[in-house]
Amino acid sequence: MSALPDLLLELLAMPCVTGDEGPIAAWLEERYAGRGERVRRCANSIVVGGEADGRPVVLLVGHTDVVPPTPEDLHPRADSDRIVGRGASDMKAGLAVAMECFEDPALRAGPYDLVLVAYAGEEGAHDGNELGPVLTAMPDLTTADLAVVMEPTDLTVQLGCMGAMHAEVTFRGRAAHSARPWQGVNALTSAGRFLDELHHLAPADVEVDGLSYREVFTATGAWSGGPTSGGAIPNARNVVPEAFTVNVNYRFAPDKTLDQAAARIAELVDGRASIEVVDGAPAGRPRRDATLVGAFIQMADAAIEPKQAWTDVARFSEVGVPALNFGPGLTAQAHQAGEYVPVQNLLDARGVMGTFLAGP
C-alpha cells in the first residue's frame, strides 16, 4: 500500500490534458499487456480485465485527462502529507486507487470480476467524452453489476447525479430606431418579468430514494440581436432589439427524464417565448435497490450524499448499470491552482475499496 503515492506521482508526471491522452493510453496499454491482461482500446481509452467467469462484474472507473496545469501544480511532488500536481484530486488519485485494487492478486481472486475502465475526454466537451463510445464498442460492460466512478467525493459515497439541460429562451419583438421606440416592440424589456421570476425562483428539493436533490434554474447568458442563435447578428446600440435570448440552465433531479425536464422549462416559460433545447444530459438514478450498491454502502461506513452535479454515473444509469461516485480526491481542489490530495485520503480510499472488493 505504501507504493500508492508513488503510483500517483507517476500518473501525474504524464502529460494528459484533454485531447492529449494518447501517451497515457499507450502507457496503460503497455503496462497491462505486459502482464498478460486482456486489454481493449477505444481511441484513447483503455479497458483491462474481465474474466467472464460468472462472478458479479465490478467496473473500476476513472478518466485519464486533466484540465490545463498552472505554475503551482505543473511539477508533481510530494509535499509533507499531500501529493501536489494537476489532476491530483480530479482524478488521478481515484485512478491510482482503482489501478492498485485491480492489480491486487487477492482482490482479483475475490468474489468479483474486476474490470478497469480508464477513459479519455471527460474534462472537455460533452460529445468528446469517450465513455459513451467505450460502452457502445464494448457492450459486455453494460451488463456489469456495479460501476464505481472514482471522481473526487471527499471519501463520501455519492449516489446518483443531477441531470443538466441548456435551453435558449427567445423573446420576440419588432425592430425600430431607438429614437422612436414606439414604432417597435422591445424584445429585451419584454423579458423583464420572466427574468425577475427566474431571479426569485427558489431551489426545489426533490427526494429520490431517500436522498434530497436540489433542483435549480439559472440564467447563464443572454444576448440581443437578430434571429441567428447565439447573437451572431449583434444588435446595434441604436436599434430596438427584435429578439432577446436567455440561456436557461436547469439542473434536475434523477426522478425526471430529459423530456420531463424540457416540459418543466416550457411550464416555466408559459408560452411567452420560443424555446430551443441546445444540450441535455440525463440524470443518474441513485439505485439504492441494487444489491452491490447496498453492499458498498454497508461496507464503506461513510457518509451517504446525493450528487449535486452531473457525472458519468448518468452514462451507466442510461444503460442500466448501477453506479456510484466514491473517491479520495477533494472536491474543493478540483481545477484549483496548486491542486493536491492528502496522502491519507489515498490510503483511506484504498482501504474502503479493498474491504468492499474482498467481499463479506
Predicted regions located by residue number:
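Acidic/His- and Gly-rich active-site-bordering loop/insert found
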Residues: 1-88, 106-111, 330
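Metal-dependent amide/peptide-bond hydrolase catalytic core
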Residues: 159, 166-360
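Acidic-glycine-rich active-site phosphate/pyrophosphate-binding loop
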Residues: 65-79, 159-171, 324
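Short glycine-aspartate micro-motif
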Residues: 57-59, 83, 143-149, 166-168, ...
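Acidic/histidine-rich catalytic neighborhood of metal-dependent amide-processing enzymes
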Residues: 96-166, 228-229, 233
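Alpha-helical metal-binding/catalytic segments enriched in His/Glu/Asp
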Residues: 60, 80-127, 168-171, 181-202, ...
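Conserved strand-to-helix beginnings and helix N-cap segments that scaffold or border functional pockets
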Residues: 22, 95, 127-132, 181, ...
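Fold-independent oxyanion-binding glycine-rich loops
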Residues: 42-44, 62-64, 119-121, 150-153, ...
